[in-house]
Amino acid sequence: MGTIPNARDLPAGSTNVPVVFVHDAAIDEFISSMLLSVMPGIDLLGLIVINADCISDPALEASSRLLQFIGRSDIPVALSRARGWNAFPWPYRGDCVSFNNLPILAQYKPQVATPPPDGEQLLTTLLQQAIEKAAPLTLLMTGPMTPLIDVLVHDTSLAKGVGRILWMGGAIDVAGNLDPSTTNPAVANTHAEWNAFWDPFSVHDVFKEFAGIHMFPLDISNSAPVSSEFIASLKQQGQSFRYSQLAYEAYSLVTGEPFYRLWDVTATCWLGRPDLYAPARAMPLTIEQWGFEQGWIHKPLVQGSKNSQNIYFKFADLAGFYQYVLTLLATNGS
């Protein structure tokens, strides 16, 4: 499967970057969906929801409501069949319920089939189309990596349809985010990050098959809190722009969680403004698949034994990052 091409390697004449967003429906991922819909040069082809840091039914309902809110009900939404090894704590997974119940979305009736569309089938179809059109996809993945591996296990040739992978996951030089108060201390090691811990085996397989993944670990997202200044700016903009008002109401749901960060928005905004990020550091990585340190991503003990990935450790312009988010949300849509 080999090295993933950079943006400059995408087919000549491409005006928009085809993006598939694979996520697990936390607050930050709903905002990322909005950002992708207004980000210049992005063609959002599909949303695939993983039943990981969410609850599937309200997550799909919220996705449907959000797409109606932004006038993009044409974007397909599907539910992945992925199953994790270590389940997210229930207290984390309820944010999608709160988002689904926001008053600003109440006027929109969810349009979700029963059973919902199959996420792996949607990803397979989009990869096949990408190969036929010679227009590889950018996969923005802000949850576990399981759906990609589940698709490739059935047809490895579909990897040709992957142009780039952006992944919010891991913790390299900082502590992980397994909290012993919500995760049994018998497994709550200090190194693992939840998107890796949920299914460390899929991370291992993706690292083995692909090089050049653009990774946004906790190292960078830790520096992007949902600050009071950011909330105040959204509130002010919300007086004129409904996208900002929705983001304000959504992030207000988590202001009581001091650990909350713009984890997924950090990865998402790189697509539009890579200049806001310090250059990535290329380094080989491995992940612990078993034992107490399960989910820990680190440099391999044997050099030269693993593919090299592109790790973003910090912003070049953190203030510019926040301003970019605010600028994108200063809209009422088309």
Predicted regions located by residue number:
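Conformational coupling and interaction surfaces
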Residues: 2-17, 31-44, 194-197, 201, ...
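Short, surface-exposed amphipathic charged segments that create phosphate/polyanion-binding patches used
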Residues: 91-98, 179-183, 231
